UniProtKB/Swiss-Prot annotation:
<dbReference type="InterPro" id="IPR000362">
    <property type="entry name" value="Fumarate_lyase_fam"/>
</dbReference>
<dbReference type="GO" id="GO:0005829">
    <property type="term" value="C:cytosol"/>
</dbReference>
<protein>
    <recommendedName>
        <fullName>Trans-aconitate decarboxylase 1</fullName>
        <ecNumber>4.1.1.113</ecNumber>
    </recommendedName>
</protein>
<keyword id="KW-0963">Cytoplasm</keyword>
<dbReference type="GO" id="GO:0016829">
    <property type="term" value="F:lyase activity"/>
</dbReference>
<keyword id="KW-0539">Nucleus</keyword>
<comment type="function">
    <text>Trans-aconitate decarboxylase; part of the gene cluster that mediates the biosynthesis of itaconic acid and 2-hydroxyparaconate. Cis-aconitate is secreted by the mitochondrial tricarboxylate transporter MTT1. In the cytosol cis-aconitate is converted into trans-aconitate via isomerization by the aconitate-delta-isomerase ADI1. Decarboxylation of trans-aconitate by the trans-aconitate decarboxylase TAD1 then leads then to the production of itaconic acid.</text>
</comment>
<dbReference type="InterPro" id="IPR008948">
    <property type="entry name" value="L-Aspartase-like"/>
</dbReference>
<dbReference type="InterPro" id="IPR022761">
    <property type="entry name" value="Fumarate_lyase_N"/>
</dbReference>
<feature type="region of interest" description="Disordered">
    <location>
        <begin position="1"/>
        <end position="22"/>
    </location>
</feature>
<dbReference type="Pfam" id="PF10397">
    <property type="entry name" value="ADSL_C"/>
</dbReference>
<dbReference type="InterPro" id="IPR019468">
    <property type="entry name" value="AdenyloSucc_lyase_C"/>
</dbReference>
<comment type="pathway">
    <text>Secondary metabolite biosynthesis.</text>
</comment>
<comment type="similarity">
    <text>Belongs to the class-II fumarase/aspartase family.</text>
</comment>
<dbReference type="GO" id="GO:0005634">
    <property type="term" value="C:nucleus"/>
</dbReference>
<keyword id="KW-0456">Lyase</keyword>
<dbReference type="Pfam" id="PF00206">
    <property type="entry name" value="Lyase_1"/>
</dbReference>
Length: 493
């Protein structure tokens, strides 16, 4: 996890704070809306102290809590309670059975040691919960639990619920990143710097333009998130093979009522072995963290000692070396890169999970259980680090100007070429300026001086015109207009 920013005198944004380790996951419960009892999801244990030393570097307490055994089982129980309620309303099971089942759908009643033993024995994580629920209900009323459902109905729907909780956190951090980029694009819209192509200086741009390009990309991720939510937040309830045969002519009615109670979209048809929804989440996380890694790469390169144009927020000892006291490593960007690389591999695994056989599969389904929690934690960590960096990013305009001047005018050679193009022809002007650039580089002289010595060029453009063309500030193109275009378009937040 990125630290709180509390010691950076250059920060212009509101003071940062890291996500609190004591944060309690807020989860809505359908049972609070149901008559006759409530499913209690409060009081989940704080899992932050049980994690390893690196856990808050490659994850966050909030995301770990979402993907914990306790929260997963809480989702199972919420689904089982909702199923009992809707089936009682439809007359499929007795109302007193539904009430009894709901009363015992509480994580506090789970024997975790027994559950672990049963899960390892059975190989699937739902039956052990159902067995305990049946046993905890009086008068045999628990026998109506899990009526017409199959294990995958519960696990897939619970996974969808956990994804919804997770993407709520993702959206919060993504929105904060977008806000920071909006601020940086506007604040630095007129700060000139060198664009780089193949790691070489290309032409002048502004730092605000560079930030606006990132802003546009992260806004596209906001759009993708909105779009995928419509497809992903969907109920899975199809019974043994998807056709709900065990519920007779009330199968689809049960499905639709259950979806409504869980605040999920009803599926158009069962999807036990059609895992495109989970794969879409994985590829979205891959795209998002890929952009975070690109951002981290640029910041790392721009913070090199020889460049020094930006720096991560300064906090004493953060990114320090055990051997070199002068070091202030871009440690947040380092971890963003590591998280993104892992998410990409996870996305590939979720695509593998799509290759499931027939109506109920033999294996690829379980890939999702392993990869999604890891991917969500890596994504959350990458987002937190990026949010921290952008909200306190140190920007050094003097260094940007210094680097613009390093080439002694070579960076505006395109401007000179275009200025000569109308009289000499573009290609001829290109070759003439190329030779002048080579001479200026070899002799370590200003390009302007070499251009003035070239009789052909000097005959077409006088000194005043060449001086204007050789000033990087005069060759910023449409940077400001592009920034205006991006900032004028509303965020998808």
């Amino acid at each position: 996890m990125a630290p709180a920013l509390n010691a950076n005198p250059t920060t212009k944004r509101d003071e940062l704070s890291a996500p609190s380790a004591s944060h309690k996951l807020g989860m809505s419960s359908m049972a609070s809306r149901a008559a006759g009892g409530g499913l209690k999801l409060t009081g989940l244990p704080d899992l932050s102290d049980s994690a390893g030393t690196l856990s808050d570097i490659f994850g966050t307490p909030q995301m770990r809590e979402i993907w914990s055994d306790q929260n997963r089982v809480a989702c199972y129980l919420e689904i089982e309670a909702a199923l009992a309620i809707v089936q009682a309303d439809l007359g499929i099971i007795p109302k007193n059975a539904a009430h009894e089942i709901v009363e015992h759908c509480r994580v506090q009643e789970i024997d975790w040691a027994l559950y672990k033993q049963k899960t390892e024995l059975i190989g699937y994580p739902v039956l052990g919960i159902v067995q305990q629920l049946v046993a905890n209900c009086k008068d045999g009323l628990g026998e109506y639990c899990h009526w017409g459902a199959t294990t995958q109905d519960i696990t897939d729907t619970a996974t969808v619920m956990q994804i919804r909780q997770s993407l709520t956190l993702v959206k919060q951090r993504l929105d904060s990143i977008v806000s920071s980029l909006e601020h940086l694009a506007e604040q630095h819209r007129n700060v000139p710097m060198a664009a780089r192509s193949n790691l070489k200086q290309a032409v002048p741009i502004t730092f605000g333009f560079k930030m606006a390009r990132f802003l546009a990309t992260f806004r596209r991720h906001q759009q993708r998130l909105v779009e995928l939510e419509k497809r992903v937040y969907t109920l899975e309830f199809g019974g043994a093979a998807g056709n709900l045969s065990s519920l007779g002519d009330q199968g689809i009615a049960t499905h639709d009522a259950l979806a409504k109670m869980l605040d999920l979209a009803p599926a158009e048809i069962a999807w036990h072995t059609e895992h495109d929804r989970f794969a879409e989440v994985g590829t979205f996380l891959g795209l998002l963290t890929g952009t975070l890694a690109k951002l981290a790469t640029d910041i790392k390169l721009m913070s090199q000692t020889e460049v020094g144009e930006v720096g991560e927020p300064f906090i004493s000892n953060r990114g320090s070396s055990s051997t070199m006291p002068q070091k202030n490593n871009p440690i947040s960007c380092v971890y963003i890169h590591a998280c993104a690389a892992n998410v990409r591999q996870g996305a590939a695994a979720l695509l593998d999970a799509m290759q499931s056989d027939h109506e109920r599969g033999t294996g690829p389904w379980e890939i999702i259980w392993v990869q999604l929690p890891l991917m969500m934690n890596w994504t959350s960590a990458a987002l937190n680090n990026a949010d921290f960096v952008l909200r306190g990013l140190q920007v050094f305009p003097d260094a940007m100007q210094h680097n613009l001047d390093l080439s002694k005018g070579l960076i505006v050679s395109e401007a000179v070429m275009m200025g000569l193009g109308n009289t000499l022809g573009r290609q001829y002007a290109h070759d003439a300026v190329y030779e002048c650039c080579r001479t200026a580089f070899v002799q370590d002289r200003p390009l302007l001086d070499v251009l003035l010595e070239n009789h052909e060029i000097a005959s077409k453009l006088d000194r005043t015109e060449l001086e204007k063309l050789c000033d990087p500030a005069n060759y910023l193109g449409q940077c400001s207009q592009w920034i205006d275009r991006v900032l004028s378009r509303p965020s998808s937040a």
